[in-house]
Regions:
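Non-catalytic, conserved peripheral segments adjacent to functional cores
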Residues: 1-40, 59-63, 68-121
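Conserved SET/PR-domain catalytic core that frames the SAM/AdoMet-binding pocket
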Residues: 39-58
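NAD(P)H-binding glycine-rich loop region in Rossmannoid oxidoreductase-like domains
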Residues: 162-200
Length: 270
């Protein structure tokens, strides 16, 4: 059947040949576009996440191989989407008539393109959802009817605790917005507050950056102008860190850790 899966796929043929057909099931103007070609050992193809994949083997002893960039899981399987091989609107010229091909019972009952469900984008996780910024993000998401957002605070996901990361299937996420932080500037100067500030503002972002880098997730990290000494009215990307207190120092350390994630944005509030 034509299955769109929630990962990228690289397909090659070790021997023999196949007729391949791909249907774009991602939301947008390209939804429903079809591409077909014959693959043999001289040609491979990259199939992006959300593009439906199907093929017919054209020779005996054909060996079809593929590499994907995520592990199968039940949660991942729930995000699959499909379109029917026989949909006349796809105009796929199958070299082997479908009535002579081997198809599963499920393949026979997949929806036509007009009823097919677009592949949903990967989820967005928001940390620190009970803080001032987190509540504002949730309010915006709700007001605009945005889908695919998941909100966590320290009671559901303490992102400064390494042991909590294995609870999540990170391949399901495309973006993490880190709105969580220890923001009690004065209390950060106390012995107890100092430890809490460094845990939330430095260790937590470092752990988020690592998991985001491992899973090609975009990390949006909210920082502060406290990482500077206040000698300039306006701050640009080239200004060096010069924090004066524990809060600013811990935030600067977190910012440095976040830059190790290839796909990151750092936003500074003031």
């Amino acid at each position: 059947g034509i299955h769109a899966e929630p990962w990228d796929k690289y397909i090659s043929i070790a021997s023999g040949s196949v007729f391949g057909a791909w249907v774009d099931l991602r939301p947008g103007d390209s939804f429903g576009q079809v591409y077909t070609t014959i693959l043999d050992p001289s040609k491979a193809i990259y199939v992006p996440r959300g593009v439906g994949n199907s093929f017919q083997a054209l020779e005996d002893d054909t060996v079809y191989t593929y590499l994907v960039n995520a592990h199968w899981s039940l949660e991942q399987k729930k995000t699959y989407t499909f379109v029917n091989l026989a949909d006349p609107d796809l105009h796929i010229q199958w070299p082997i008539p479908l009535e002579d091909s081997e198809r599963s019972e499920a393949d026979l009952h997949h929806p036509m393109l007009k009823d097919a469900k677009p592949m949903a984008p990967r989820r967005t996780m928001v940390t620190g959802c009970n803080g001032q910024l987190g509540r504002a993000i949730r309010s915006y998401v709700d007001a605009h009817g945005l889908e695919g957002f998941e909100f966590n605070d320290i009671d559901t996901f303490d992102f400064s605790d390494p042991a909590q990361y294995d609870r999540f299937d990170w391949s399901l996420y495309g973006t993490v917005i880190n709105a969580g932080a220890y923001t009690a500037v004065d209390k950060a100067e106390t012995a107890e507050g100092r430890a809490l500030a460094w845990k939330a503002n430095a260790q937590g972002p470092a752990l988020l950056a690592r998991v985001c880098a491992e899973h090609n997730i975009t990390l949006v990290h909210v920082s502060s102008d406290y990482v500077f000494d206040g000698s300039r009215e306006l701050h640009d990307e080239a200004e060096a860190f010069a924090p004066l207190g524990v809060y600013g120092q811990s935030k600067a350390a977190g910012d440095i850790a976040v830059t190790n994630c290839p796909r990151h944005y750092i936003l500074r509030s003031s």
